Structures are given as C-alpha cells and as structure tokens.
Amino acid sequence: MFSKDKLPVILFLFLAGVINYLDRSALSIAAPFIQDDLTLSATQMGLIFSSFSIGYAIFNFLGGVASDRYGAKLTLFVAMVVWSLFSGAVALAFGFVSLLIIRILFGMGEGPLSATINKMVNNWFPPTQRASVIGVTNSGTPLGGAISGPIVGMIAVAFSWKVSFVLIMIIGLIWAVLWFKFVKEKPQETIKEAPAIKAETSPGEKIPLTFYLKQKTVLFTAFAFFAYNYILFFFLTWFPSYLVDERGLSVESMSVITVIPWILGFIGLAAGGFVSDYVYKKTARKGVLFSRKVVLVTCLFSSAVLIGFAGLVATTAGAVTLVALSVFFLYLTGAIYWAVIQDVVDQNNVGSVGGFMHFLANTAGIIGPALTGFIVDQTGTFSGAFLLAGGLAVFASLAVIRFVRPIIGKPAGTEAENPVSY
C-alpha cells in the first residue's frame, strides 16, 4: 500500500503519537497519588488538567504556522524536546501553582504535533492516501494512552509516581534524536511525483490564510473537532478518577481497566481513515466531502449517545463498556477532521489552517476538565458531566450536516478558478 521509503515516516509519526499520549495520560493515571501528595481538591485538579490545554491550544496554531514556515521536521523535533523536558519536570512539582505552570509549558511543547503530522502527510502522500495515513499515524495516540495505565500505575505503586515522568522524558528525547537524524522533510521524488502529491493549487497561487479562517467549512469542522475533544479530554483526564472515586476501584484495577477503551480507540483511529477513503472511492461522484461527512456524522453521533448513557447505568461493567464503545466510535472520526482540511485547503496553507482548527478544537481541553471538576464538586457525581459531553457532540454532528460544504470560489486577487472546491 505504501512504498518502502515512506514507511519510516509513518513509523516515526506513529511513535510520536504513542509518546504524546503516554506523556499526556500519565498525569491522569497518577492523579490519585498526586492529589494526595500535593493536597489538591477536585476543582484544583480540574484546573491542572485544563492548564495543559492553555499552552497546547495556542501552540496548535503557532505550530502549524511554524511547520509551513520552517518545515515540519524541525518544528516537531523542537516540540518533542520541549514537551519531554517538561514532562520530566512534573516530578519537581511541589504544589498547585508549580504543577499548573509546568503543565502549561508541557502543553506548549505538545501543541505543534498534530499540525506537523498533517503537514508531513501532505508533503509525502497523495490525496487518495492521506486520510488512511493520518488514521494510521494518529492511532499511536490511543495506543500510548493504553500502555500509560499499566506502566505509570505499576511504577507509581512499586516506586513513585515521579519516577514514571522521568522515564517518559528519556523516551521522548531518544525519539527526537533519531527523528532529526533519519527523517527528511520531503521525499526525494517529490519533483517527479508532484502532480500526485501536492495539493490541487499551483505553487504560484497566493491564497491568503485569512480567506480560509472565515470559511464555514473550516469553522464548523473545528466545532465538530471541539466536541470530539470535549469527550476525549473528559475521558483522558477524569475517567481514571471516576473509576476510583465514584466506582470504588483500586488504582491497580483502574490502571488495567482503562486499557480497554484505549485499545478500542486504537482500532477505531487506525480504521477510520481507511473507512473514509473507502467510502470516498465508492461515492467519488458525490465529492470527497460527502464521504468524510458520512463517517464523521455517523460515528460522532454514536459516540455522543453512548457517552451520555454511560453516566446513567448502575454497574461499573456497563459504564466501562459504554465508554469503551464511545471511544471507539469517537476515534473512527479522528482522521476525518484533518482530511477535510487536506481536501479544501491549498498546500501552502494546510499547516496553518490545520493548526487553527486544532487551536479552536482544543479550547475544549481548557473548558471541559475544569467544568467537569466544578460539576463533580457541586453535585458529588459525574452523571451531569457525561450528559453534557454527549449533548454537545450530538449538536456538533448535526451542525456538520448543515455547514460543512466544498469551498467554492476564490479570494480577490488570486488567479486560479475555484482552487479549493474539490
């Protein structure tokens, strides 16, 4: 399916995703220990979970701009070094404020990842493969979340939660050195394969970034991605604490059980891009966005219903099953948001527009965890938080049907006709 010279790029990007969520999930797994050691309330813990997304969301956009200007390879190298160092710095936290600051800086480091992956895929692969490649590379993230539970949980119980953050830092720094040494920005055959690999627009076209930032297709794709991230951050940050605090599980049991949704998420994200590309090939006459919307709306709506009901069931097994299925359907859409941007944006702007979309989407990571902590403190239960996450995603999936459409026309001063209407 993919040529041998491109497989290392896929592997490195996949492993970057694994490390990304190994780092990011570690705090959630270690949260019961950290809360006790630093004497933090649920509201304070929610603010710490949210603080990550303050730096993360801002650098989603700035990282995308940097990947367009300085190249995805260099941008991702710097990002990995920064986030690995601040992952290790979590072990130095001595209170609420210090941990809050470290998590903001850690989020800044992780921010450029998705936009740089999107840019690298755009550099290396033709449009017919991009959703599949994005799905495969991004599937590393739920796998990282899956292995984070057992690894961090066992290390925290056997040694200390601080040790796990130092080990994860070392893994990230090793990846950064190998990435910089072995991966190229673009394939050597780019010139020969230019008609297949580059975006539909020609190099001479100058379409301003602001043209895309005002398009409903970009804005409502970002809104759907916001709903996706609201569910994801709810699961990522609070689900371990929900199992321990509301369901009464031990940290050891929680560490094992959290693997189940992540494994289904890994399968969903890896398969989602292939499903979208397959639907596209079968419905090509209806346009590429039709296939993206079919997968996105169906799966996001299903995820929303499942997560909403998960907070209402009486048994732990039922709640875990519904959350796991919700994560599976959620991750089936994971590659689609990026594929939509690939489909409607020219090559010169794809990193920046993707970063802008990701920035808007990840404000959910600022709002969601803090709001969940507040809801839990006020009500003493997670039920309302589950229902809010599901309701938001239902609304977003319906908005996609109405507003995500091909971008027809061109901004004033460009030469191409309908450059992004395919």
Swiss-Prot record:
It comes from the Bacteria. It is a multi-pass membrane protein. The chain crosses the membrane at residues 9-29, 45-65, 82-102, 141-161, 163-183, 219-239, 256-276, 294-314, 321-341, 356-376, 381-401. Induction: Induced by galacturonate, repressed by glucose. The keyword Cell membrane applies. Keywords: Cell membrane, Membrane, Transmembrane, Transmembrane helix, Transport. One of its GO terms (cellular component) is plasma membrane. Its main location: membrane. It holds the Pfam family MFS_1. InterPro entries: MFS (IPR011701), MFS_dom (IPR020846), MFS_Na/Anion_cotransporter (IPR050382), MFS_trans_sf (IPR036259), Sugar_P_transporter (IPR000849). It is found in: Cell membrane. It catalyses: aldehydo-D-glucuronate(in) + H(+)(in) = aldehydo-D-glucuronate(out) + H(+)(out); aldehydo-D-galacturonate(out) + H(+)(out) = aldehydo-D-galacturonate(in) + H(+)(in). Member of the exu locus which is required for galacturonate utilization. PANTHER family: FI19708P1-RELATED, SOLUTE CARRIER FAMILY 17. Belongs to the major facilitator superfamily. Phthalate permease family. This is Hexuronate transporter. It comes from Bacillus subtilis (strain 168).
